[in-house]
Amino acid sequence: MKERWRFLIEGSVQGVGFRNSCRRRALDLGLCGWVRNLKDGVVEIQAEGDELALNELRLWCERGPSAATVKRVLLSKIPVTGNDWFDVRT
């Protein structure tokens, strides 16, 4: 069953390639959705797919790309929207 999760990634996560790395990982996992930087320094991700793939993305987010320092990952389940792509938003 398809689910949609919202991730808020806190730490040193902007300007380190987090969004593009996240997009690649999400596509590898067969997920749809988007990722963007927020003005407060947080990275927001909304991803949609099966629970196992979403959990794998969560595990990846806890580490992030090598240049990132992840302090905390906040997660919430949100309504499925039916996206069929994964985009980097500005």
From Swiss-Prot:
GO terms of molecular function: acylphosphatase activity
UniProt enzyme class: hydrolase
Domain Acylphosphatase-like stretches: 4-90
UniProt KW keywords: Hydrolase
A Pfam family assignment: Acylphosphatase
Residues annotated as the enzyme's active site: 19, 37
PROSITE patterns to which the protein is assigned, alphabetical: ACYLPHOSPHATASE_1, ACYLPHOSPHATASE_2, ACYLPHOSPHATASE_3
Domain of life of the source: Bacteria
The reaction(s) this protein catalyses: an acyl phosphate + H2O = a carboxylate + phosphate + H(+)
EC code: 3.6.1.7
InterPro entries: Acylphosphatase, Acylphosphatase-like_dom, Acylphosphatase-like_dom_sf, Acylphosphatase_CS
Claim: Hydrolase is one of the keywords in the record: yes
Classification via NCBIfam families: PRK14452.1
Similarity-based family: Belongs to the acylphosphatase family.
PANTHER family assigned to the protein according to its UniProt record, in alphabetical order: ACYLPHOSPHATASE (PTHR47268:SF4)
Protein name, per record: Acylphosphatase
Biological source species: Synechococcus sp. (strain CC9311)
Gene name in the database record: acyP
